[in-house]
């Protein structure tokens, strides 16, 4: 790996569900892996995100054997090197979003390799609704003309966005989850 490689990771906030199915490291730096549920494909999945520049070696360890592992989109399959029945490695030199699917779509791992952020707004900047690292239960976030919603890496915002106007942006490397929004709550898993 080149000396100019850079990796930024963001610790998961306390209380957020961690995956016990996967472990991820980028250039030797551990990356927190979240556990999540969706409405499709049997629901359970895991995801991890990090920022990098230069080259990155991503090592994924799985509690279950990585039999018949596939990467989607398929154009990234050439990145994959199998190290053992439970470990694979990937090499990347540009941002990516992939799904690592073992034995079909059973508990896939979604990986988000983002470009290192260079122009992040600061708390208190005008027209910026800023969320720092941590868990934030917001309900509805209303955005209007010329506003930016910014989610810092390590922020988990549990709410929904109502945007009405022009020149509205949502940025950052945090997580915006609608699982606590009344629209998605219900008597069951979803």
Task: Please place each PLM-identified region on the residue numbering.
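Extracellular/periplasmic carbohydrate-active domains that bind, remodel
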Residues: 1-190
């Amino acid at each position: 790996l080149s000396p100019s490689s850079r990796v930024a990771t963001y610790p998961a906030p306390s209380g957020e569900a961690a995956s016990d199915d996967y472990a991820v490291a980028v250039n030797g730096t551990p990356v927190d892996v979240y556990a999540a549920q969706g409405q499709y494909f049997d629901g359970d999945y895991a995801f991890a995100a990090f920022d990098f520049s230069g080259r990155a070696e991503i090592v994924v360890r799985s509690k279950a054997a990585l039999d018949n592992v596939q990467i989607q989109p398929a154009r990234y399959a050439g990145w994959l090197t199998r190290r053992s029945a439970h470990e694979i490695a990937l090499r990347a030199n540009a941002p990516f979003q992939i799904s690592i699917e073992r034995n079909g779509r059973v508990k896939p791992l979604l990986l988000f390799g983002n470009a290192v952020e260079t122009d992040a707004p600061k708390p208190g900047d005008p027209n910026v609704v800023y969320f720092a690292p941590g868990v934030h239960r917001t309900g509805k976030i209303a955005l209007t003309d010329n506003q930016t919603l910014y989610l810092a890496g390590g922020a988990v915002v549990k709410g929904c966005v109502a945007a009405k106007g022009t020149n509205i942006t949502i940025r950052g490397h945090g997580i915006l989850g609608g699982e606590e929004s009344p629209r998605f709550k219900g008597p069951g898993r979803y």
